[in-house]
């Protein structure tokens, strides 16, 4: 591979990464704005974030986690 081709490829990769990083930043701001809007309407943002995290779990993992949490709460009388 010639130095020119390598340079062009590297520049393309860097350019793509920069563009995606900018998009990621824009999306993060949109998510933040949505959470702020939800909070202004009385929703609990912490609970919403917990729900989003739980939704990413496999159904079996979620069931295991729920069972363990219930066991610990019962054990501690919570």
UniProtKB/Swiss-Prot annotation:
Molecular function, one GO term: DNA binding
Entries under InterPro entries matching the protein: GapR-like, GapR-like_DNA-bd
Disulphide-bonded residues: none
Similarity annotation: Belongs to the UPF0335 family.
NCBIfam families assigned to the protein according to its UniProt record, in alphabetical order: PRK13694.1
Protein name stated in the entry: UPF0335 protein RP113
Naturally occurring in which organism (per UniProt): Rickettsia prowazekii (strain Madrid E)
